[in-house]
Amino acid sequence: MLLTIDNVLTEEELAAASSLLAESAWVSGLVTAGAQAAKVKNNQQLPEDSPQMAALRGLVLGALNRNALFFTATLPKKIMPPFFNRYSGKTNHYGFHVDNAMRMLPDGVGYVRADVSATLFLSNPQTYDGGELVINDTFGQQSVKLQAGSMVIYPSSSVHQVTPVTHGERIACFMFIQSMVRDPNQRRLLYEMDMALLQLRQNIGETEAVVSLTGTYHNLLRQWAES
């Protein structure tokens, strides 16, 4: 399932993130690339020891914690601390690749299984040319280029790339989510049921049938979720 979520960051949060990123120093994006990805990755990344990293991560995670659509679509069990990357000049693209299934936490203690990948755009699309996130999966090929502050989520098993940025600068935040529901088809069914329940409540209220169907949703989640 591919899903876009608008306005994950408020205007104030986006301005704060932009200010922090403007003060940041960047390093080669190869620091987090696996063996396959290293052959096609050509961008820059904010290093772990960046003075701005903690504030930026706190800002993004705080926004995700209050976003109901992000929760129902990903059902997060663990969220890998977000990373930040930049595409511009000669470091301007990332060829087709698949994200590693297991991601080591930045502190080196433990792993996160990458079930869902997410990109939070931090540059407005009018400010750069190229830089589309192209994703191939069972839903076909999708090209994504969103307004700053908006996010796309998609299965981490998807083959994807960032096309060359030929003018301007593309800055984004990316992260990996381990879901309580590992199977993407089960996760999609739960999302669709939750959205249908939301629409039913708006249309007809908390009827007996809606309450019963809500119980079915939670029983399915109880059956499929990992503790």
Curated annotation (Swiss-Prot):
Record Gene3D superfamilies: q2cbj1_9rhob like domain, Rabenosyn, Rab binding domain
Keywords assigned by UniProt, alphabetized: Dioxygenase, Iron, Metal-binding, Oxidoreductase, Vitamin C
Binding residues for Fe cation: 97, 99, 160
Needed cofactors: Fe(2+); L-ascorbate
Molecular function terms from GO: 2-oxoglutarate-dependent dioxygenase activity; iron ion binding; L-ascorbic acid binding
The keyword Iron belongs to this UniProt entry's keyword annotation: yes
Cofactor note: Binds 1 Fe(2+) ion per subunit.
Span of domain Fe2OG dioxygenase: 78-179
Alphabetical GO biological process terms: DNA damage response; intracellular iron ion homeostasis
Domain of life: Bacteria
PANTHER family per UniProt: PKHD-TYPE HYDROXYLASE YBIX (PTHR41536:SF1)
Name of the molecule in the record: PKHD-type hydroxylase Neut_0373
